[in-house]
């Protein structure tokens, strides 16, 4: 039987399959590289029913996995229909699916397609970016995290439930070295002296908020008892930055700077608007992070050496450094 509802379900299934394999290939394979991905091993692409989950299957190359993902997206996106969802943001609704497609094409180095998919989500001038001012009226513990993941926030395109006992056994001190720590903030991001937006972001008072995980209940099934049970998979903010990056790599600097300024206006207190020359000269004068293998001393800055498999010029590099700070 065929019906509009079944076609919509098929569309979401295709997009979900594409997303699952996208996550897996970037976890177990190398990043996409036009020069090497035809031989780099990726993951098996399961596009057929399986009965034996333990059977060994040959790994597709990274290039093959990306081709299959694109095929699923091309077939699945036109079939989506949000009218069948009771809770759209827990599904691959249209905007979430196009946001994923934008991210995928950015990884796939198909910049024009990434820009096209992002614009499907945002329109030419998005008005649904995250309202960071709303965080100022909240407490600095659970309410802050819950507001970020709240279904009603227009900037949140898709949510997912998660369940993990890791936080019960690994405290913040243990994993702090891998997190956005105070040292990172001082030398590389928010509080760095070279920061173009001068430590002036709208949710600044919550830069050191914490979550009290001292009391918890073990449940048989995932339940929404705290702020660690729901995550945001796609947002308008990230999709805007995907489009900005795609425009930078196409040398559409006017469009890229416009997108970066939309993000800056939403996030920073004085709502700054930068020119391209300000961004390029600002990052041009920042030294690269460095490490001396003899003394084993490191000097961390906002600026890391970028090593893409494609060529970028000076203007593109410095615009990308700005984007990476957003």
Predicted segments with their positions:
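Aromatic-anchored glycine-rich loop motif in surface-exposed flexible loops
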Residues: 1-82, 86
